[in-house]
Amino acid sequence: MTNIRKTHPLMKIVNHSLIDLPAPSNISAWWNFGSLLGLCLGIQIITGLFLAMHYTSDTLTAFSSVTHICRDVNYGWIIRYLHANGASMFFICLFLHVGRGIYYGSYTYSETWNIGILLLFAVMATAFMGYVLPWGQMSFWGATVITNLLSAIPYIGTDLVQWIWGGFSVDKATLTRFFAFHFILPFIIAALVMVHLLFLHETGSNNPTGIISDADKIPFHPYYTIKDALGFLFLLTLLLSLVLFSPDLLGDPDNYTPANPLNTPPHIKPEWYFLFAYAILRSIPNKLGGVLALVLSIAILAVMPLLHTSKQRCMMFRPISQALFWILVADLLTLTWIGGQPVEHPFIIIGQLASFLYFLLILALMPACSLIENKLLKW
């Protein structure tokens, strides 16, 4: 008799995606981050659901409802901190996943890559709106500053901002709609993940050599299920260590002060995972220019398949490109540091140089370097 997993309509889909899926035999630990992102999304949805049971999206009670979760709800503190630090883990995995895609040329699967960029935007939007919900000082002022950027759009900007706010300032209407969007977006993200995987399984996974591996495939289960399980163990160990030993390490102390529209914090800054984009935004003196640079800092990923000039797919055998890639990583770390610093000398000029280098590397230096490497191949 044929196994039920190969005949049942639903089980068949699971079987083709997770069990009998042909996978390259040589994919490294860098390919673990896809499944880790799935785990992070699952953790965020489950913890978020339990938080939503006790949270109230009203300006008068939002802050105290979060305090109530931490103090009075059974294990509320661990649910809240798993959710807050789970977001940090999510972004660590996201950045490493995108970095892997750039290094190994996975962006040549353009459909999968473009859905991935959409996912990145969706997760960033969700995280931003989630940060507003506790209604602390940084929540309120972060929401005010970032939504206000849309006023830079010519002609419709001011109307657009007031439409998003639901009034003339960030208030109850804004908080309520942000909670609604923050609740629904993870499910939209989950649907996009399915599309992401659908496109990936059309082509099959890339591998560290960048060479087509159809001749040498192994079943996903048990080889990569056990490998993913090990990744889960590492991620959960790191997350639980963070939650149980230093839950506020990545947070902002200002967010433990209830939102006050009459008192601006000395340094308004987003969560650490947005600091690189925030630094790029601040590095341009013009408001509209800054907003465009902010959007382009992520949207630039969409042009990577078009800028691929190398005859080889991945960077494994391209040492000059490797050097530029690691300069890009160092540049992003520099931008992250600058984003958390006050707007004063020498941080302003460092931020401007790092922002310029970021775009220069992706748009000019890396494609030019690939052409040079093509020439070197002929020697």
From Swiss-Prot:
GO molecular-function terms, A-Z: metal ion binding; ubiquinol-cytochrome-c reductase activity
Membrane disposition: Multi-pass membrane protein
Biological process terms in GO annotation: mitochondrial electron transport, ubiquinol to cytochrome c
Record: residues binding heme b b566: 97, 196
UniProt cofactor note: Binds 2 heme b groups non-covalently.
InterPro entries recorded: Cyt_b/b6_C (IPR005798), Cyt_b/b6_C_sf (IPR036150), Cyt_b/b6_N (IPR005797), Cytb/b6-like_sf (IPR027387), Cytochrome_b (IPR030689), Cytochrome_b_C_euk/bac (IPR048260), Cytochrome_b_N_euk/bac (IPR048259), Di-haem_cyt_TM (IPR016174)
Entry binding sites for heme b b562: 83, 182
Oligomeric and partner information: The cytochrome bc1 complex contains 11 subunits: 3 respiratory subunits (MT-CYB, CYC1 and UQCRFS1), 2 core proteins (UQCRC1 and UQCRC2) and 6 low-molecular weight proteins (UQCRH/QCR6, UQCRB/QCR7, UQCRQ/QCR8, UQCR10/QCR9, UQCR11/QCR10 and a cleavage product of UQCRFS1). This cytochrome bc1 complex then forms a dimer.
Family, similarity comment: Belongs to the cytochrome b family.
UniProt-recorded name of the protein: Cytochrome b
Organism per entry: Ochotona huangensis
Gene designation per UniProt: MT-CYB
